[in-house]
Each structure stands twice: as structure tokens, then as C-alpha cells.
Amino acid sequence: MAKLTKKMKAIKAGVDSTKAYEINEAIAVLKQFATAKFVESVDVAVNLGIDPRKSDQNVRGATVLPHGTGREVRVAVFTQGANADAAKEAGADLVGMEDLAEQIKKGEMNFDVVIASPDAMRVVGQLGQVLGPRGLMPNPKVGTVTPNVAEAVKNAKSGQIRYRNDKNGIIHTTIGKANFSEVQLKENLQALLAALNKAKPTTAKGIFIKKVSISTTMGAGVAVDQASL
């Protein structure tokens, strides 16, 4: 059996794994154990009442968090003409068509989000094997294939998160950093849950949001009492 580190022992002693914490208390616990030498991310896992084996029950989408994620996001945009100018003005880091595709084929991928206008998908389609496995392929369901590329760039830069359930019906995403205030983290979490409720499949029956847990990169993980949200 693996030996528990001093930090792991402290977390085990300080966190009640059988308890669902009131949200402010949950955040306070996370902050107490977020002692890494870097600013840890605050991540969330949401267990959904869906059957992930059924395609019509899978949940996928995007939402802009009111306080952002605390990360600087680099955005690449496939578009041309007036849309290219609009994307640059909105803050896109890379804008192009075939030239941008060639960079990506060479392995130059210094970006976190890829956005494309519909007319550019003929170029982006060639990059499926490169972008797909990295979760970077533009998709209209999350707003990354759109005629309004400028708005998509602004959303990505201002703290938009994308979410998709895994094979166990769980959504994993981030809601900020450990140095965010309790109010900022709570409001970001509320925004995510509101977006998930709006995206509830019509075929999903019973309780939709079954469990909400928050954790930091290197620290504690706690269940959240949904009544406190």
C-alpha cells in the first residue's frame, strides 16, 4: 500500500469524505489545503443522471463564467476576409486559413482554443486527426464553429469553459483558481450548474444533477451540498 504523505494525512484528517459541505465551507476547506508553490486550479466534477451509452443523453456545451477561469487563453481562428480582421480586433492570437493549417501540421500548436467560420471548415476538416484527440476540433455545439468569430474569440478570452460528460456520465471542468474569492468561485459554480440544467436532455429521467464535488490541483476534494447553491 502506498505510503501517505504528510499533506495527504492532513487532508484525510481534515476532510470528512462522508459529508456534503455547505458551499462556503467547502471552498474554505479547499483553500486551507491549497498549499502548492503555484496557484492551484479549482476543478469540479458533476455526476449527471444520464445514460452515457445513449447518444441522445450525452451533454456537451459551453458557458462563460462570470469571473473567468484565471487562465490566459490563446485562441487560433480559421477564417478569412472581414472575419479575419474582426477576429484580430477581438484579440485572436493566430488567424489564418491554409497557412495556419500548415503550421499545425508541422506541430506548431501554441494555442488552447480553435475557432472556425463555417466557410473555413473545408481547411479545418483536414486537421481532424491532429486536433480531435486533443479536444481542439471546432464544433458548432460549443460555439467554436460560427459565422460570428469575433464574439467567439471574446467569449474564449473572457473565461468560457467547454464541458462534455465522460463515459461514466460525469462532467469535469474548472471554475477558477484557489486565489479567487469565495463569492467568485460560488458564482462561477452556479453559472456552470445553470448551464448544465439548461442542457438537460429531454430523455433524461429522475434527478439530473446527482452530485457536485470540487477539488484543487494538488489538494483536497470535497462534496458540495447543492441546497447551499
From Swiss-Prot:
The keyword Nucleotide-binding does not apply. One of its GO terms (molecular function) is structural constituent of ribosome. One of its GO terms (biological process) is translation. GO terms for cellular component: cytosolic large ribosomal subunit. PROSITE patterns: RIBOSOMAL_L1. SUPFAM superfamilies: Ribosomal protein L1. CDD domains: Ribosomal_L1 (cd00403). Keywords: Repressor, Ribonucleoprotein, Ribosomal protein, RNA-binding, rRNA-binding, Translation regulation, tRNA-binding. The keyword Aminoacyl-tRNA synthetase does not apply. Binds directly to 23S rRNA. The L1 stalk is quite mobile in the ribosome, and is involved in E site tRNA release. Protein L1 is also a translational repressor protein, it controls the translation of the L11 operon by binding to its mRNA. Part of the 50S ribosomal subunit. Belongs to the universal ribosomal protein uL1 family. This is Large ribosomal subunit protein uL1. It comes from Haemophilus influenzae (strain ATCC 51907 / DSM 11121 / KW20 / Rd).
